[in-house]
Each structure stands twice: as C-alpha cells, then as structure tokens.
Design a protein with these regions (language model features):
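SAM-dependent methyltransferase catalytic region
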Residues: 1-188
Length: 188
C-alpha cells in the first residue's frame, strides 16, 4: 500500500502520473554524470568534443521549457487534468533522449571494461544535435545492450526536473526534503 500525507488541502488527490515513478533509485546518474565517460570517468570536454557540453545543456534547457506547462495547474477539474496529461506527454517526449542517455550511461558503467566510451560519446553527440536517437541506436548493438542493462535506473533530475532544476540550471539546494518509510516511523 502507499501512504501519501502531503496534498493540497481542499483539492482531490489527482494526477499522480508525474509523482509515482518506478525505477532503481540507487544507481541512476544525475545530468552532470552524463557529461563524463562512463568507463573512464573522464569529462567529455576535449576540443574534439566540439563544445558538446554546451550543446547538450542547451538541448536540455529547451526540453525543460515544458516543465512550466506541467506545473501551471493543480488538476482541480477534468480540463485541468487533460492539460496536465498533455503537458506531461510533451515533457516526457522532450526528455526521452536524455533518459535514454542516462540508461546507456548506467548500463555502460555496469558493464565496466566491456562498456564503450566511444559508443556513448557518439550517442551524446546525437542527443546534443537533436538527431533521431532510435536510428543511431539501431546502428550500434552495443548501445542497445547498454540501454537494456541500465534501463531501470532512475535519473532523478531527468524524472523530476522541477525539483532539481530552475530554468535548465542546477540549483544549489535542489532535491527532495522528505523521508519515505513504512509505519511505524516513530521507532526509527
């Protein structure tokens, strides 16, 4: 069962689509991790990367523009809920390449020396250039393997961007201010 104690008083508990997420919360990377090679741990910032970090941040900023649409209402009626569903769908589509990047990064880390920094770098370039990620994935079976292995890992700042970011840049005190646990929590 699920206990939720926090809600907007006087309003129904609605639109949990964006709040309840399934995934491995211990092994997912944050966006900053995606700017490093998963095997070597080296930053992706050399001249050969052609300002890949800046382009990737710009693309993420464009995707995060959809967060405001999602947070524009509280879901007080059917029209509001429809608007939230549409906004959530647009946000998910915009963040999908970054979530794929996070899955591949995690899978590559899990593979260790069998992972491929080169395949990861090629995918980063594809995402930064806003190219079709599925075509790129199908051309490199190693990416599919890494994606499958890391697919359940939860990248918190890509799943809950409104909590961890403000206008596409990391906040100093970003994150959750809660502890979730099973009752009886008075015995912790």
């Amino acid at each position: 069962s699920l206990w939720i104690e926090s809600y907007a008083e006087g309003l129904p508990l609605t639109f949990l689509d964006h709040r309840l997420i399934r995934g491995d919360s211990l092994t997912g990377p944050f966006f900053e991790d995606l700017l490093t090679f998963p095997v070597s741990g080296e930053p992706i910032d050399d001249l050969f990367a052609q300002q890949i970090n800046e382009r990737l941040r710009k693309t993420l900023g464009e995707a995060l523009a959809h967060v405001n649409d999602l947070e524009a209402s509280v879901g007080k009626d059917v029209a509001d809920l429809e608007q939230k569903h549409t906004a959530k769908k647009r946000l998910d589509e915009a963040l999908s390449p970054f979530r794929m990047l996070a899955a591949v990064w995690s899978g590559c880390v899990m593979l260790g020396d069998r992972g491929s920094d080169l395949a990861y770098r090629n995918l980063v370039t594809t995402v930064a250039d806003q190219e079709n990620i599925d075509i790129h994935k199908s051309l490199q079976p190693a990416l599919q393997q890494m994606s499958d292995l890391g697919g359940q890992n939860l990248a918190y700042d890509l799943v809950f961007p409104e909590v961890f970011r403000l206008e596409g840049s990391p906040e100093r005190n970003a994150g959750f201010d809660s502890i979730l646990g099973n009752p009886p929590w008075d015995r912790i």
